């Protein structure tokens, strides 16, 4: 099974060796990938799109809700920056799509620091591809239910 090509930004997502080694379950829908699909992202699989269709059948406004959530994220980061907050910990960060915390923060304050944390292997692998070697931005695979483990993780 392959990831969907295209997406809101018109790019493609190729499965990295890191993602393949991460033990991705291609047969089970995943919340991070469903959210990515509902935002128009490109890192989701047929099983995720099928589940999203079921969700949309029950709640046709769900894609709008996801976009509203993303809009709130942008406003919240901008507000924090305007008030001197320059360090961000994004727990359950999901699959990177347009308008990520680091894109917003670094556009306004290049010295800002962003740590992404997610447990889902596809989200973490794709985040590593998107983030690359950006200074002041880290990606960590950890379970946010283990607060001490998250805070002790390298990069956080």
Where are these regions (language model features)?
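Rossmann-like AdoMet
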Residues: 1-142, 146-156
């Amino acid at each position: 099974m392959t990831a969907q090509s295209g997406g809101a930004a018109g790019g493609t997502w190729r499965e990295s060796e890191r993602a393949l080694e991460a033990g991705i379950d291609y047969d089970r829908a995943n919340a991070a990938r469903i959210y990515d699909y509902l935002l128009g992202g490109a890192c989701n699989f047929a099983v995720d799109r099928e589940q999203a269709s079921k969700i949309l059948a029950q709640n046709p406004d769900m894609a709008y809700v996801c976009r509203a959530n993303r809009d709130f994220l942008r406003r919240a980061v901008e507000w924090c920056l305007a008030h001197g907050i320059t360090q961000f910990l994004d727990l359950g960060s999901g699959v990177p799509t347009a308008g990520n915390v680091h894109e917003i923060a670094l556009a306004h304050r290049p010295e800002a620091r962003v740590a992404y944390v997610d447990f889902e292997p596809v989200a973490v692998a794709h985040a590593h591809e998107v983030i690359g070697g950006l200074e002041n931005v880290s990606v960590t695979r950890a379970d946010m239910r283990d607060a001490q483990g998250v805070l002790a993780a390298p990069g956080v």
